[in-house]
Amino acid sequence: MTATNHPKLFKRPVDGVLLLDKPGGMTSNEALQRVKRLFHAKKAGHTGSLDPLATGLLPICLGEATKFSQFLLGADKSYSVKGRLGVRTASGDSESPILTERPIPKLTKRALEKTLSAFRGVIDQTPSMYSALKHKGQPLYKLARQGIEVERKTRQVTIYELTLLDWDNESIELYVHCSKGTYIRTLLDDVGEALGCGAHVVALRRLRVAHYHEDQMIKLAHLEREYDKANYTGLDRYLLPLETMVSHFPAIKLSSSTAFYLQQGQAVMVPNAPTHGFVRLRDQNDQFIGIGEILSDARIAPRRLIQKR
Protein backbone atom coordinates (compact mmCIF):
# COMPACT_ATOMS: atom_id res chain seq x y z
CA MET A 1 0.00 0.00 0.00
CA THR A 2 1.47 3.35 -1.02
CA ALA A 3 1.41 6.53 1.03
CA THR A 4 -1.09 8.06 -1.35
CA ASN A 5 -3.87 5.66 -0.32
CA HIS A 6 -2.87 4.81 3.25
CA PRO A 7 -5.70 5.87 5.62
CA LYS A 8 -3.46 7.12 8.47
CA LEU A 9 0.16 8.21 8.36
CA PHE A 10 2.40 9.58 11.04
CA LYS A 11 4.02 12.89 10.16
CA ARG A 12 7.62 13.84 10.77
CA PRO A 13 9.73 16.99 10.62
CA VAL A 14 11.66 16.82 7.35
CA ASP A 15 13.39 19.78 5.68
CA GLY A 16 14.49 20.29 2.09
CA VAL A 17 13.50 21.09 -1.48
CA LEU A 18 12.22 18.50 -3.94
CA LEU A 19 12.39 19.43 -7.62
CA LEU A 20 9.34 17.53 -8.83
CA ASP A 21 8.64 16.82 -12.48
CA LYS A 22 4.90 17.42 -12.26
CA PRO A 23 2.86 15.06 -14.44
CA GLY A 24 0.24 16.39 -16.81
CA GLY A 25 -3.42 16.14 -15.84
CA MET A 26 -2.74 16.93 -12.19
CA THR A 27 -3.10 20.20 -10.30
CA SER A 28 -0.08 21.59 -8.48
CA ASN A 29 -1.86 21.11 -5.16
CA GLU A 30 -2.62 17.46 -5.94
CA ALA A 31 1.07 16.92 -6.73
CA LEU A 32 2.04 18.70 -3.52
CA GLN A 33 -0.24 16.53 -1.39
CA ARG A 34 1.07 13.34 -3.01
CA VAL A 35 4.67 14.34 -2.23
CA LYS A 36 3.76 15.42 1.30
CA ARG A 37 2.24 12.01 2.01
CA LEU A 38 5.16 10.11 0.48
CA PHE A 39 7.64 11.94 2.71
CA HIS A 40 5.31 11.80 5.75
CA ALA A 41 6.03 15.53 6.02
CA LYS A 42 4.38 17.70 8.64
CA LYS A 43 4.58 20.79 6.47
CA ALA A 44 4.86 21.36 2.72
CA GLY A 45 4.25 24.01 0.10
CA HIS A 46 5.10 24.79 -3.51
CA THR A 47 6.56 27.88 -5.12
CA GLY A 48 4.12 28.76 -7.88
CA SER A 49 1.37 26.78 -9.59
CA LEU A 50 1.55 25.00 -12.91
CA ASP A 51 -1.63 24.48 -14.92
CA PRO A 52 -3.03 20.92 -14.82
CA LEU A 53 -2.14 20.56 -18.51
CA ALA A 54 1.48 21.56 -17.83
CA THR A 55 4.40 19.34 -16.87
CA GLY A 56 7.83 20.07 -15.51
CA LEU A 57 9.61 21.76 -12.67
CA LEU A 58 7.55 22.29 -9.53
CA PRO A 59 9.80 23.00 -6.53
CA ILE A 60 8.19 21.56 -3.40
CA CYS A 61 9.35 22.88 -0.05
CA LEU A 62 9.23 20.59 2.96
CA GLY A 63 9.42 21.76 6.57
CA GLU A 64 11.72 24.74 7.12
CA ALA A 65 12.12 25.20 3.36
CA THR A 66 8.65 26.80 3.30
CA LYS A 67 10.19 29.84 5.03
CA PHE A 68 12.19 30.61 1.89
CA SER A 69 9.57 29.90 -0.78
CA GLN A 70 9.08 33.63 -1.46
CA PHE A 71 12.54 33.76 -3.03
CA LEU A 72 11.47 31.24 -5.67
CA LEU A 73 7.99 32.70 -6.16
CA GLY A 74 9.64 35.89 -7.37
CA ALA A 75 12.24 34.18 -9.56
CA ASP A 76 12.59 34.05 -13.33
CA LYS A 77 11.24 30.94 -15.04
CA SER A 78 11.74 29.19 -18.37
CA TYR A 79 9.29 27.13 -20.44
CA SER A 80 8.87 25.27 -23.68
CA VAL A 81 5.39 25.69 -25.13
CA LYS A 82 3.57 24.29 -28.13
CA GLY A 83 0.55 26.08 -29.51
CA ARG A 84 -2.07 25.20 -32.06
CA LEU A 85 -2.69 27.96 -34.58
CA GLY A 86 -6.06 28.99 -35.98
CA VAL A 87 -8.08 28.26 -32.84
CA ARG A 88 -8.61 30.58 -29.89
CA THR A 89 -10.08 29.21 -26.64
CA ALA A 90 -11.60 30.73 -23.51
CA SER A 91 -8.69 29.76 -21.26
CA GLY A 92 -5.90 29.95 -23.79
CA ASP A 93 -5.33 26.18 -23.65
CA SER A 94 -6.98 23.03 -24.94
CA GLU A 95 -9.09 22.47 -21.83
CA SER A 96 -11.83 25.04 -22.43
CA PRO A 97 -14.42 25.87 -25.11
CA ILE A 98 -13.36 27.20 -28.51
CA LEU A 99 -14.08 30.90 -29.01
CA THR A 100 -13.05 31.38 -32.64
CA GLU A 101 -11.61 29.43 -35.55
CA ARG A 102 -9.83 31.34 -38.30
CA PRO A 103 -7.74 30.45 -41.35
CA ILE A 104 -4.01 30.35 -40.79
CA PRO A 105 -2.01 32.67 -43.05
CA LYS A 106 1.04 31.37 -44.87
CA LEU A 107 3.80 31.73 -42.31
CA THR A 108 7.49 32.23 -42.95
CA LYS A 109 10.29 32.26 -40.43
CA ARG A 110 10.87 35.93 -41.18
CA ALA A 111 7.22 36.80 -40.52
CA LEU A 112 7.16 34.77 -37.32
CA GLU A 113 10.38 36.34 -36.03
CA LYS A 114 9.02 39.80 -36.77
CA THR A 115 5.87 39.02 -34.78
CA LEU A 116 7.80 37.52 -31.88
CA SER A 117 10.12 40.53 -31.68
CA ALA A 118 7.20 42.63 -30.43
CA PHE A 119 6.88 40.34 -27.41
CA ARG A 120 10.47 40.54 -26.19
CA GLY A 121 11.46 42.84 -23.35
CA VAL A 122 8.94 44.57 -21.09
CA ILE A 123 5.38 43.92 -22.29
CA ASP A 124 1.84 44.43 -20.99
CA GLN A 125 -0.32 41.41 -20.21
CA THR A 126 -3.95 41.16 -19.21
CA PRO A 127 -4.34 37.97 -17.14
CA SER A 128 -6.85 35.41 -18.35
CA MET A 129 -10.11 34.90 -16.48
CA TYR A 130 -8.85 31.32 -16.16
CA SER A 131 -6.17 32.22 -13.63
CA ALA A 132 -5.67 31.93 -9.86
CA LEU A 133 -5.79 35.70 -9.36
CA LYS A 134 -8.57 36.71 -7.01
CA HIS A 135 -11.45 39.16 -7.30
CA LYS A 136 -13.07 39.99 -3.96
CA GLY A 137 -11.60 36.81 -2.51
CA GLN A 138 -12.79 34.57 -5.33
CA PRO A 139 -10.32 32.96 -7.79
CA LEU A 140 -10.96 34.22 -11.30
CA TYR A 141 -11.13 30.71 -12.76
CA LYS A 142 -14.10 29.91 -10.51
CA LEU A 143 -15.91 33.00 -11.76
CA ALA A 144 -15.03 32.10 -15.35
CA ARG A 145 -16.59 28.65 -14.93
CA GLN A 146 -19.80 30.39 -13.84
CA GLY A 147 -19.76 32.50 -16.99
CA ILE A 148 -18.79 35.63 -15.04
CA GLU A 149 -16.16 37.98 -16.44
CA VAL A 150 -14.64 40.85 -14.45
CA GLU A 151 -12.23 43.59 -15.43
CA ARG A 152 -8.56 42.69 -14.92
CA LYS A 153 -5.73 45.14 -14.56
CA THR A 154 -2.99 45.02 -17.16
CA ARG A 155 0.40 44.16 -15.66
CA GLN A 156 3.94 44.54 -16.93
CA VAL A 157 6.13 41.46 -17.28
CA THR A 158 9.52 40.91 -18.87
CA ILE A 159 10.24 38.39 -21.61
CA TYR A 160 14.00 37.95 -21.47
CA GLU A 161 14.11 35.38 -24.26
CA LEU A 162 11.54 34.25 -26.81
CA THR A 163 12.92 31.72 -29.27
CA LEU A 164 11.16 30.07 -32.18
CA LEU A 165 11.92 26.35 -31.87
CA ASP A 166 9.72 24.97 -34.65
CA TRP A 167 6.57 25.62 -36.63
CA ASP A 168 4.41 24.10 -39.35
CA ASN A 169 1.06 24.86 -40.98
CA GLU A 170 -0.88 24.22 -37.77
CA SER A 171 1.41 24.72 -34.79
CA ILE A 172 4.25 26.71 -33.28
CA GLU A 173 6.82 25.81 -30.61
CA LEU A 174 8.58 28.42 -28.48
CA TYR A 175 11.14 28.68 -25.70
CA VAL A 176 10.31 31.39 -23.15
CA HIS A 177 12.49 32.85 -20.39
CA CYS A 178 10.37 35.29 -18.42
CA SER A 179 9.90 37.20 -15.19
CA LYS A 180 7.55 36.25 -12.38
CA GLY A 181 3.88 36.79 -13.06
CA THR A 182 4.08 35.93 -16.77
CA TYR A 183 1.14 33.92 -18.10
CA ILE A 184 2.34 31.69 -20.93
CA ARG A 185 -1.23 31.01 -22.06
CA THR A 186 -1.82 34.74 -22.35
CA LEU A 187 1.48 35.21 -24.19
CA LEU A 188 0.59 32.58 -26.78
CA ASP A 189 -2.93 33.96 -27.12
CA ASP A 190 -1.48 37.41 -27.79
CA VAL A 191 1.00 36.00 -30.31
CA GLY A 192 -1.87 34.23 -32.07
CA GLU A 193 -3.84 37.47 -32.29
CA ALA A 194 -0.79 39.28 -33.67
CA LEU A 195 -0.53 36.60 -36.37
CA GLY A 196 -4.20 37.19 -37.19
CA CYS A 197 -5.36 33.62 -36.68
CA GLY A 198 -5.46 33.01 -32.94
CA ALA A 199 -3.67 30.28 -31.00
CA HIS A 200 -3.88 28.25 -27.83
CA VAL A 201 -1.54 26.12 -25.73
CA VAL A 202 -1.60 22.36 -26.29
CA ALA A 203 1.60 21.49 -24.39
CA LEU A 204 3.53 23.41 -21.74
CA ARG A 205 6.63 22.36 -19.82
CA ARG A 206 8.47 24.35 -17.17
CA LEU A 207 12.21 23.88 -17.59
CA ARG A 208 13.73 26.18 -15.02
CA VAL A 209 12.93 28.12 -11.84
CA ALA A 210 15.68 30.51 -10.73
CA HIS A 211 18.89 28.44 -10.79
CA TYR A 212 17.06 25.08 -10.59
CA HIS A 213 16.82 23.32 -13.96
CA GLU A 214 15.19 20.31 -15.58
CA ASP A 215 18.18 17.98 -15.17
CA GLN A 216 17.55 18.00 -11.41
CA MET A 217 13.90 16.95 -11.56
CA ILE A 218 12.49 13.78 -9.99
CA LYS A 219 9.40 12.08 -11.39
CA LEU A 220 6.48 11.36 -9.07
CA ALA A 221 6.24 7.77 -10.34
CA HIS A 222 9.89 7.22 -9.36
CA LEU A 223 9.23 8.49 -5.83
CA GLU A 224 6.24 6.18 -5.52
CA ARG A 225 8.30 3.17 -6.64
CA GLU A 226 11.02 4.06 -4.13
CA TYR A 227 8.40 4.41 -1.39
CA ASP A 228 7.02 0.95 -2.19
CA LYS A 229 10.53 -0.50 -1.80
CA ALA A 230 11.54 1.06 1.49
CA ASN A 231 8.81 3.40 2.75
CA TYR A 232 9.88 7.02 3.17
CA THR A 233 13.37 6.13 4.42
CA GLY A 234 14.92 6.15 0.95
CA LEU A 235 13.35 9.38 -0.24
CA ASP A 236 15.27 11.99 1.74
CA ARG A 237 18.27 11.63 -0.55
CA TYR A 238 16.28 13.41 -3.27
CA LEU A 239 15.93 16.56 -1.17
CA LEU A 240 18.19 19.54 -1.82
CA PRO A 241 19.48 21.58 1.15
CA LEU A 242 17.54 24.66 2.25
CA GLU A 243 20.45 26.93 1.42
CA THR A 244 20.18 26.11 -2.29
CA MET A 245 16.99 28.20 -2.38
CA VAL A 246 18.94 31.36 -1.56
CA SER A 247 22.40 30.53 -2.90
CA HIS A 248 22.35 33.68 -5.06
CA PHE A 249 22.68 35.86 -1.92
CA PRO A 250 26.15 36.55 -0.47
CA ALA A 251 27.10 34.51 2.59
CA ILE A 252 28.09 36.02 5.95
CA LYS A 253 29.86 33.96 8.61
CA LEU A 254 28.93 34.97 12.15
CA SER A 255 30.70 34.66 15.46
CA SER A 256 28.96 32.60 18.13
CA SER A 257 27.84 35.73 20.01
CA THR A 258 26.58 37.48 16.87
CA ALA A 259 24.67 34.37 15.80
CA PHE A 260 23.13 34.16 19.28
CA TYR A 261 21.81 37.74 19.20
CA LEU A 262 20.47 37.33 15.67
CA GLN A 263 18.62 34.21 16.72
CA GLN A 264 17.04 36.24 19.52
CA GLY A 265 15.63 38.57 16.87
CA GLN A 266 18.15 41.40 17.30
CA ALA A 267 19.87 43.29 14.47
CA VAL A 268 23.67 43.13 14.65
CA MET A 269 26.75 44.72 13.12
CA VAL A 270 29.01 42.41 11.11
CA PRO A 271 32.38 43.58 9.74
CA ASN A 272 32.79 43.64 5.93
CA ALA A 273 29.11 42.89 5.28
CA PRO A 274 27.47 44.03 2.01
CA THR A 275 25.85 47.46 2.05
CA HIS A 276 22.33 46.41 1.04
CA GLY A 277 20.03 43.49 0.23
CA PHE A 278 19.65 40.00 1.64
CA VAL A 279 22.48 37.82 2.95
CA ARG A 280 22.83 34.16 3.84
CA LEU A 281 23.64 33.69 7.51
CA ARG A 282 26.13 31.04 8.60
CA ASP A 283 27.05 30.34 12.21
CA GLN A 284 30.50 29.84 13.71
CA ASN A 285 30.41 26.21 12.52
CA ASP A 286 29.65 27.36 8.96
CA GLN A 287 26.10 25.98 9.19
CA PHE A 288 23.30 27.79 7.37
CA ILE A 289 20.89 29.36 9.87
CA GLY A 290 18.75 31.63 7.68
CA ILE A 291 18.44 34.91 5.81
CA GLY A 292 19.14 38.42 7.03
CA GLU A 293 18.67 41.86 5.48
CA ILE A 294 21.03 44.82 5.56
CA LEU A 295 19.38 47.84 7.22
CA SER A 296 20.04 51.49 6.36
CA ASP A 297 22.35 51.78 9.39
CA ALA A 298 24.43 48.81 8.08
CA ARG A 299 23.19 46.36 10.72
CA ILE A 300 21.91 42.94 9.69
CA ALA A 301 18.36 42.12 10.76
CA PRO A 302 17.09 38.51 10.85
CA ARG A 303 14.34 37.85 8.29
CA ARG A 304 13.96 34.06 7.99
CA LEU A 305 15.71 31.82 10.51
CA ILE A 306 15.54 28.04 10.52
CA GLN A 307 14.59 26.00 13.54
CA LYS A 308 17.31 23.69 14.75
CA ARG A 309 16.20 20.04 14.80
From Swiss-Prot:
The GO annotation for biological process reads: mRNA pseudouridine synthesis; tRNA pseudouridine synthesis
Q: Name one GO molecular function term.
A: tRNA pseudouridine(55) synthase activity
Pfam families, A to Z: TruB-C_2, TruB_C_2, TruB_N
Active-site residue list: 51 (nucleophile)
- Say which enzyme class the record assigns: isomerase
For this protein, the record's InterPro entries field holds: PsdUridine_synth_cat_dom_sf (IPR020103), PsdUridine_synth_N (IPR002501), PUA-like_sf (IPR015947), PUA_sf (IPR036974), tRNA_psdUridine_synth_TruB (IPR014780), tRNA_sdUridine_synth_fam1_C (IPR015240), TruB_C (IPR032819)
| Superkingdom classification of source | Bacteria
Q: What is its EC number?
A: 5.4.99.25
Sorted keywords for this record are: Isomerase, tRNA processing
Q: Which reaction does it catalyse?
A: uridine(55) in tRNA = pseudouridine(55) in tRNA
Family matches, as PANTHER family: PSEUDOURIDYLATE SYNTHASE TRUB1, TRNA-PSEUDOURIDINE SYNTHASE
What the entry lists under HAMAP family is as follows: TruB_bact
Family the UniProt entry places it in = Belongs to the pseudouridine synthase TruB family. Type 1 subfamily.
| Role according to the record | Responsible for synthesis of pseudouridine from uracil-55 in the psi GC loop of transfer RNAs.
Its name, as the record gives it, is tRNA pseudouridine synthase B
Provide the taxonomic classification.
Bacteria, Pseudomonadati, Pseudomonadota, Gammaproteobacteria, Legionellales
